């Protein structure tokens, strides 16, 4: 899928920089953030973000708290949780809170790209359904 824009959130700057380079080579636009608070700020300032890649353990605002805020304020944005020191159960808990999926660190870039594309497609499908419902509602009001 082309024209995918993601927000990559992790407090490990070298990790973010390495992943950004790899994702950009694959045509994915990447906006970096280094904690949950910065992620929320980026979502408010950057339109068109399809997917958030969100680390769980971060300073200022951890990933689980950020996930709750993101899904509350930006319900259509899909979130993929990253678990390093956390457990699989933490990743599953994130999915119960609304995350699209999770990945265990270290993970394969190809696996991440597949999940990002699937999540972006789901977001765009949801946006399309909402638009169709709005058009239908307007059409019904006119008749």
Predicted regions mapped to residue ranges:
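Charged docking surfaces used in two-component/phosphorelay signaling
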Residues: 17-25
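Helix N-cap/capping motif at the beta->alpha junctions
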Residues: 32-41, 63
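Short amphipathic alpha-helix used as the core "switch/output" element in two-component signaling
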Residues: 41, 64-76
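Receiver (REC) domain active-site loop signature in two-component systems and cognate sites
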Residues: 58
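C-terminal output helix
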Residues: 107-117
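CheY-like receiver
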Residues: 122-143
